[in-house]
A protein has these predicted regions:
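Nucleotide/pyrophosphate-binding catalytic subdomain
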Residues: 1-177
């Protein structure tokens, strides 16, 4: 579907996370991980793994997949060109970023050159420190910065939950306010 949209002239941008791959790598490296309110507490070692997995393995895997299908994709990270600018969300969470600004220059350049930008959800603060960002939040902020006509979420979870710990709290209808 991504390639079809691209072929008919729709500017498609793919923003991704990679929680399961991050978990697998943290486990393999024997780095303990825990969550607070659905957000991964991210110390420096964890951030190194997050960046390695998202900007490396997952991002390049998606680019390779799209390329194998005949697409023209380019792998980007929110750090590139200071694209996703953040500040630390909460000291308790460590290097988890709250998005302050999206600089669309790199995205616009990639789109103008005919590429499908594939963007990993890692941001950067004013001191050059990478931060972990929720991919859904990054996608939403990027779509808003680009005045996108449409935003589509694909996920490995059932949908939006009123209580993330309660699978019966799935919201079947959302209203934009």
């Amino acid at each position: 579907d991504i390639l079809l949209l691209h072929l008919i002239g729709v500017n498609v941008i793919l923003v991704h996370g990679g929680g399961p791959d991050i978990n697998a790598m943290l486990d393999a490296l024997k780095i303990e991980s825990h969550f607070e309110n659905g957000l991964r507490v991210t110390d420096k070692d964890t951030m190194d793994v997050v960046q390695m997995v998202l900007a490396g393995k997952v991002n390049k895997g998606l680019v390779a997949y799209l390329s194998a299908l005949g697409g023209k994709a380019i792998g980007l990270c929110g750090i590139d060109g200071n694209m996703i600018q953040v500040h630390t969300k909460n000291e308790k969470l460590g290097l988890v970023g709250e998005i302050d600004h999206i600089d669309t220059d790199v995205i616009d350049s990639a789109l103008s050159a005919g590429f499908i930008p594939v963007i990993s959800s890692v941001g950067i603060d004013s001191h050059g420190q990478p931060h972990n960002i929720n991919a859904d939040t990054a996608a939403t902020k990027i779509a808003a910065a680009l005045n996108a006509e449409c935003l589509v979420f694909m996920s490995n979870i059932d949908g939006v939950m009123k209580d993330p710990k309660d699978k019966d709290s799935l919201l079947h209808k959302l209203t934009v306010v």
